[in-house]
Amino acid sequence: MDHGELFFHFELQNYEIRFKISKFVIVISKPIPMAKKYRFNEDWASVFVGLIIVVAIIVATIIPDIPKILPKFGPKEGWTGWTVLSTEVFTSGNSVRVLMTFLYFFFFAIVGSWLMGRKGKELLPAFPIVFILSMISQFIASAGLMKDLGLETVLFSLVIGLFVSNVIGTPKWLKEGIQSEFYIKIGLVMLGATILFSEIMKAGLFGVLQAVIIVLSVWYFAFWIAKKLKVDSELAAMLASAVSICGVSAAIATAGAIKGDSKKLSYVISLVLIVAIPMMIVMPLLSRWMGLTPEVTGAWIGGTIDTTGAVVAGGTIAGDIALKFSTIIKFSQNVLLGIAAFIISIYWTYRKSDNDPAEKPSLKLIWQRFPKFVLGFIATSIIFSFFINPETAVAAGKTIKSYQSLWFNLAFVCIGLETRFKDLVTLDRGRPAYAFLIAQAFNIILTLIVAYVLFGILWE
């Protein structure tokens, strides 16, 4: 084998995949259709693909000679002008990275399609278009202004998909290649790499205590108020998780756990990202006006604002100490994501059984309905928390987060392509939006009280 060459070979009966990277060249052998008895459902296929990608990234982290393929979109603070674009983004080397990234993701999308018993040819015209749209959304989100506003790429992915769907129209051949739920589940399996036990230790007793109190209290209140406003249970669960846990990721994980409607998911995420913008600006100003300590300010911001980018932006405005505490509290809530997804999955299985008395909630039924990608999420988290060198875990985790984000971007482009904007605006006559805003107001007040008691009175 040549130096710097990667070669992957998977074999099952009547099925073969060959994958080779050498000098930026990928070769995929022609597949033989998988025998029916070897087909996976979407959950297991996402676990398989997600874990293979995670293992590949760990290997690439340990072996430095393996080339990095993800494209660059400017410095961490975002691109601000043509000078940065011409020297860091619009370069021949970056063009090769974009091509390599496309081939890498296309390969795994096809692998997933084959594992589920499909031919994979439906992806050939559709996936390149979806990928290009996701790259455009990534480029826009990487602008300095968008970074300052804390706007995440998934918002632009959704908006671009909605634009194509509602202005141009999504052709049938493109719809046939849309796999939004599969891409989301792959991303969720990989998300486990960023949920580490060590983060709980960093937060300490008070950080974990605040996270548990807020998540439990706000989730219950948000679900209750949504039901009072006659929002359906599926949408209410997504709203409650988004408000109480960690915004976008929590909404996505909950949608996967309850097999929720992707249109409702996109609605919730739009609310989360839009509401986070004024909060990250107003909350630091309110903290100064009320004379809160930096510790209380950080705990309040981290426990209330629903997106990590907006938390960092709000914490930065409030000062270095507030930024540190807001980040720690946010990580504490993020850690609870896997536990929450597991509990919601079990609850939803029993709830379905209650609606259908003929089906008793046996262990077999629970297993059949349980979203298997949650197991992949938990497995990845355990591997990175306990079985990998901490330095390797941190380095690989950063790369995995970038790959996971791109899977989410692809998913939300797909969701936008199959959604009519009118359906989002008129969803339940605005009742979910009212429920979200009321729940967020409750979250702001309760978190302020808890943060003040823990970090203003008890904290030394």
Stretches with model-predicted labels:
Residues 43, 231-279, 295-319, 403, ...:
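Alpha-helical membrane segments and immediately flanking helix-loop junctions
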Residues 51-54, 127-139, 159, 182-195, ...:
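Small-residue-rich segments of transmembrane alpha-helices in multi-pass membrane proteins
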Residues 91-104, 147-160, 203-216, 241, ...:
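Structural signature of hydrophobic alpha-helical transmembrane segments
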Residues 94-98, 126-131, 135, 182-223, ...:
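Entry/N-cap segments of selected transmembrane alpha helices
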Residues 140-142, 146-252, 256-266, 280:
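Glycine- and small hydrophobic-enriched segments that form the cores of compact globular domains
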Residues 197-206, 287-295, 316-328, 452-460:
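Helix-coil boundary and interhelical linker segments in multi-pass alpha-helical membrane proteins
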